[in-house]
């Protein structure tokens, strides 16, 4: 019998806000005069969660699996990347326990969009929404986030493998 193995992963991502791009966070299009600059759709929230999953499983990071130097990922939908990351984590023998994430942005206000983000993350990871949490924070007008030059996302995930008692959600 395999011993119980519980792990925590932490993810971080940041992208600059620029004109002429859509703002997508948690797979949700958010109306704004600027969007995030990046090789893919630049969804900082999903990138942070993806990085946390890979890190928890000891599988490296998002750049190792989906390099921004690879043309096949140009404009990629980060929800597709998140689903693939979850598949690889499960292929390594782990179950995903929960996700807790924060998005730091002065503007736009994200609270109205959080239920959609949570629904997308839960759907992509095959988890109940009760195990996915997204928080929106400002940086109190400090730093590049406060000056509305970019958006930061941070995420923590719990994964496990081995015998575990049935848990109730």
Swiss-Prot record:
Name the source's superkingdom: Bacteria
UniProt remark on cofactor binding: Binds 1 divalent metal cation per subunit.
Q: Which UniProt keywords apply?
A: Isoprene biosynthesis, Lyase, Metal-binding
User: Which EC numbers characterise this protein's activity in its record?
Assistant: 4.6.1.12
Q: Does the keyword Metal-binding apply?
A: yes
Q: Which organism is it from?
A: Cupriavidus pinatubonensis (strain JMP 134 / LMG 1197)
The cross-references to Pfam families, in alphabetical order and at most eight, read: YgbB
Gene name of the record: ispF
Q: What class of enzyme is it?
A: lyase
Cofactor(s), names only, from the UniProt record: a divalent metal cation
Record-marked site positions (Transition state stabilizer): 39, 138
Put simply, this protein is called 2-C-methyl-D-erythritol 2,4-cyclodiphosphate synthase
């Amino acid at each position: 019998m395999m011993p119980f193995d519980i792990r925590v992963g932490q993810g971080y991502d940041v992208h600059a806000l620029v004109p002429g791009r859509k703002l997508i966070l948690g797979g949700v299009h958010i109306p704004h005069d600027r969007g995030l600059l990046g090789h893919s759709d630049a969804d900082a929230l999903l990138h942070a969660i993806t990085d946390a999953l890979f890190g928890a499983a000891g599988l490296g990071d998002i750049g190792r699996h989906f390099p921004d130097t690879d043309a096949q990922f140009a404009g990629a939908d980060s929800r597709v990347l998140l689903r693939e990351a979850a598949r690889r984590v499960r292929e390594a023998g782990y179950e995903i326990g929960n996700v807790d994430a924060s998005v730091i942005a002065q503007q736009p206000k994200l609270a109205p969009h959080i239920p959609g983000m949570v629904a997308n993350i839960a759907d992509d990871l095959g988890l109940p929404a009760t195990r996915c949490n997204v928080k929106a924070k400002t940086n109190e007008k400090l730093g590049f986030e406060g000056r509305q030059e970019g958006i930061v996302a941070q995420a923590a995930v719990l994964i496990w493998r081995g015998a575990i008692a049935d848990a109730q959600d």
